[in-house]
Amino acid sequence: MFFRAYAKINISLDVVGKREDDYHLLEMIMQRIELYDILEVTKNKTGINIKCNKSYVPLDERNLVYKAAKLFLDTYNLKGGVDFNIIKNIPVSAGLAGGSSDAATTLLAMRELYNIDVSDDELCKLGLKIGADVPYCIKGGTALCEGIGEKVTNLKGFKGHILVLVKPKFGVSTKEVYKSLDINKIYRHPNTEGLIKAVENNDLRYVSENMRNVLENVTLKKHTIIKEIKEKMIRSGALGSMMSGSGPSVFGFFDDMLKAQRCYEYFKSKYNDVYITRTI
């Protein structure tokens, strides 16, 4: 059986507090995009086996697919195992939830493969044990995510909007970005309520002009190239441009495919991981 594991972008990312265990409390609007990994999943009699088309992806218990499969088998006391063949298209350490989406898709695939009667909400609780973005990746679409990311409220779809996505030639550690964030020095928060209304009204211009990610300045201090990519996107005709998640991926929304294509071609001459895609 084949399953798609979709990437996400952030339309907004705000940090509104911090728990005693040092996890940050978030308020984010997440959006699924048409960039995906493919998971080929097959039952076997014993063990979890992983293959992948990218050599840098670990094939053992460090892989979130492995963790998700093991968690599912253990939780429901299932005998047997599963083989995975991962076709990796989403860049790693990019702020696009590639690993979390693979884990979420693994849980959904295991439910189908083993015919277990378990709701999406129950899968989300399992997924949270793997990572804070996994519950959103199970539900997908357009959503407001709160808490550490586990409270997912689906919004009316913000579908079909063109974006150009660029991942620079380095990765970023989410943990390190949050560690470097001083929540007392966040002077400009996103207007999450206004963005929710704009998303639900399908108002691309308002969304593009008012997107905000409070982690951007943290990552920018170490990687000024992010600012340069954003500025070039705007000059290329993007309605707005922002870093996704903890970075370093940057995206820009376009209302003109020709402008988007030209922007794509410019960045493709400089970077490997460049995409024209859409919100879904």
From Swiss-Prot:
An example molecular function term from Gene Ontology annotations: ATP binding
Secretion signal span: none
Lineage: superkingdom: Bacteria
UniProt keyword terms in alphabetical order: ATP-binding, Isoprene biosynthesis, Kinase, Nucleotide-binding, Transferase
Annotated active site: K8, D133
Official protein name in the record: 4-diphosphocytidyl-2-C-methyl-D-erythritol kinase
Pathway membership, UniProt: Isoprenoid biosynthesis; isopentenyl diphosphate biosynthesis via DXP pathway; isopentenyl diphosphate from 1-deoxy-D-xylulose 5-phosphate: step 3/6
Organism: Clostridium novyi (strain NT)
Family matches, as PANTHER family: 4-DIPHOSPHOCYTIDYL-2-C-METHYL-D-ERYTHRITOL KINASE, CHLOROPLASTIC
Chain's role: Catalyzes the phosphorylation of the position 2 hydroxy group of 4-diphosphocytidyl-2C-methyl-D-erythritol.
Binding site for ATP: P91, V92, S93, A94, G95, L96, A97, G98, G99, S100, S101
Residues spanning the membrane: none
UniProt GO BP: isopentenyl diphosphate biosynthetic process, methylerythritol 4-phosphate pathway; terpenoid biosynthetic process
InterPro entries referenced in this protein's UniProt entry, alphabetically: GHMP_kinase_C_dom, GHMP_kinase_C_sf, GHMP_kinase_N_dom, IspE, Ribosomal_Su5_D2-typ_SF, Ribsml_uS5_D2-typ_fold_subgr
Pfam annotation, one family: GHMP_kinases_N
Classification via SUPFAM superfamilies: GHMP Kinase, C-terminal domain (SSF55060), Ribosomal protein S5 domain 2-like (SSF54211)
UniProt keyword Lipid biosynthesis present: no
Catalytic activity annotation: 4-CDP-2-C-methyl-D-erythritol + ATP = 4-CDP-2-C-methyl-D-erythritol 2-phosphate + ADP + H(+)
